């Protein structure tokens, strides 16, 4: 099998010739390379929307920073400014003042319909397919989440109050965000990506941030709308869902909505083996390997042992191995051990 076939088979819950791997779920610079997945020849490459034209200079600044300076995902930082979200300065949130839908002034939310945001996207996907690589694509940050985008626009504490006291406003904001997301996932589907990356951190290490009933009331139907639009545009595309923390309680409901693969299933938050025993190889698992201490302070042999254990207990069907945490501070020899172990044991 080539990489594209391998990933598509694994994410369908079937058995590939070996377990595929990636270095995360977005393109990230490591060890002087702009793309860790290219550097280590993983099975997946990632495409993304271009930054807004008026903010494109930020990318030049980010790329000029030393390798040991980490300021977050460039894909996130490029879009924060236009949404009025400035966590580094704790500036007021764009919709902090709103008490009802009538208070949301037209034009405060960014226009995501500019075709310049996805110029060349189809060509990028086609070029990667010619290399027989699987291609994953995510909507732009803030334009690609529901829960996270809403609380960043309102402020976290204020949005928690909204869910109880200002539900018409919540519905209005989430409907606007859902419309943006539907358009963005349709663009990605029509560009030909193999895996649609949906990302919404609804959990902490101790469980869901909001109750399951609140998630079902506000977020499940809208997520279903997004997935439905993606399926209509590209029926064979795999649907990926990421949340930090422990979202075990949502796994069966995500699968019922059409999610094919969940991520990162971090071992210090979720029990991947219990999920596998309960649900089988669908949804597939993307991630599962190591907590932050393993990657940052563990030895290459410990990484190898973790990979071998994951393959033996979770694989080979329905599994794509990846670090369950960012690799910003991981020694290169640990990442090399991960790749070598996947190829040896997978």
Residue ranges and their predicted role:
Residues 1-346:
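Catalytic cores of TIM-barrel enzymes
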């Amino acid at each position: 099998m080539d990489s594209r076939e391998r990933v598509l088979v694994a994410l369908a819950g079937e058995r590939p010739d070996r377990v595929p791997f990636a270095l995360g779920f977005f393109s990230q610079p490591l060890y002087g390379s702009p793309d860790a997945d290219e550097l280590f020849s993983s099975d997946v490459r990632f495409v993304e929307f271009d930054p807004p034209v008026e903010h494109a200079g930020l990318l030049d600044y980010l790329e000029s920073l030393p390798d040991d300076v980490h300021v977050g995902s460039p894909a996130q930082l490029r879009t924060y400014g236009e949404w009025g979200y400035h966590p580094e300065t704790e500036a007021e949130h764009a919709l902090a003042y709103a008490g009802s839908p009538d208070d949301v002034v037209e034009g405060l939310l960014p226009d995501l319909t500019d075709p310049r945001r996805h110029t060349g996207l189809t060509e990028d996907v086609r070029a990667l397919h010619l290399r027989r690589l699987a291609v994953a694509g995510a909507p732009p940050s803030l334009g690609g989440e529901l829960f996270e985008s809403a609380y960043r626009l309102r402020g976290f504490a204020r949005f928690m109050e909204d869910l109880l006291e200002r539900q018409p406003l919540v519905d209005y904001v989430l409907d606007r965000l859902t419309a943006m997301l539907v358009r963005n996932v349709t663009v990605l589907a029509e560009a030909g990506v193999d895996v649609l990356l949906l990302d919404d951190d609804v959990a902490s290490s101790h469980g869901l941030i909001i109750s399951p009933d609140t998630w079902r009331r506000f977020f499940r139907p809208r997520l279903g709308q997004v997935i439905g639009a993606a399926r209509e545009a590209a029926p064979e595309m795999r649907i990926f869902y990421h949340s930090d923390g422990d979202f075990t309680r949502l796994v069966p409901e995500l699968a019922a909505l059409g999610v094919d693969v969940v991520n990162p299933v971090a071992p210090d938050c979720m029990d991947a083996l219990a999920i596998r025993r309960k649900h089988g190889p669908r949804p597939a698992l993307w991630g599962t390997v190591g907590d932050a201490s393993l990657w940052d302070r563990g030895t290459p042999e410990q990484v190898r042992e973790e990979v071998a254990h994951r393959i033996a207990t979770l694989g080979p069907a329905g599994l794509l191995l990846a670090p369950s945490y960012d690799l910003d501070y991981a020694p290169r020899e640990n990442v090399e051990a991960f790749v070598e172990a996947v190829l040896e044991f997978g």
